[in-house]
Structure formats: structure tokens, C-alpha cells
Amino acid sequence: MNEFINKDILNYVELNSQQEPTLLKELNKETNLKILNPRMLCSSYQGRVLSIISKIIRPKNVLEIGTYTGYSALCIAEGLDKNGIIHTIDINEELKEIQNKYFKKSGFGNQIQQHIGNAIEIIPKINECFDFVYLDACICWITWGITWSYGCKFIIK
């Protein structure tokens, strides 16, 4: 049970949420067993919300800052336009293997572009207009988002 959420709220969410897809359950389990700081993983409930929002928006160009093990990117990919792409950035090179593994297994691997390094250096090289930006790493990116992403939809964790 999640120690940060009120039990009544958690019970309500559990009763009224979509089930976590099997692949995401596998990724969740592997992250918790093998990766340092698994609490950084997006919860299954947050993932379902990201999926629903993505399905409503049907984004073509997505920017995610903070890939971690790829859970949230896979949730967003569920609603991605058939010709859409997710640019996901993480500074931790050690996580690329687990990200790749699950991106390939998902069927969205060709629509998810991984970038390893400092987002402030990578974003200008991508040179895209994003219609969905998910800031999952550092709240400091809010300033960037407000300044450079007119017209985007933001999900800020």
C-alpha cells in the first residue's frame, strides 16, 4: 500500500481505475527488484491518467524529461498518434538497457526516441514543436516550459 496516499482515496482510485497492462506490471516489478530508488517510478494510477490524457490529446510530438525506466513514456505511447514520436530524455545512462528492453517489447519502440544527457543541451538539437510535454524530472523545467512551449499541454508531476 502506498504510504503517501490516504487509504480512502487509494481505495476509490483502485475501484475506479483501469487495470495496469501486463507489460507495465513486468516493468514495475523489474524496476522495484533491480533499480536503485524504485520510488521514483510513476505509480500505476499516474500511468493510467497519463494514458487517458494521451488518448484524448492524440499527440504527434511528445517531450518527456525524466525517462527513469520508461514506465511513463510507455503510458503516454498508448495514446500517441500513429505517426507520432516521443522524445524522452534522461541523464542516467545506466538505465538505457532497461528502457530499451521494454520499449522494444511494447511495440512502440520505433516511436520512442531515447536521449541520454542533459536536457538543456538536448532539447535545442531536437528542434520540434511539442504538443505534449511531460516534466517528470525537475520542477525547474516549469520555467523552460512556460517560455518555450506555447500551445503545449503540460502534465507536471
Each model region followed by its residue ranges:
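A short alpha-helical cap/connector motif
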Residues: 1-132, 139-156
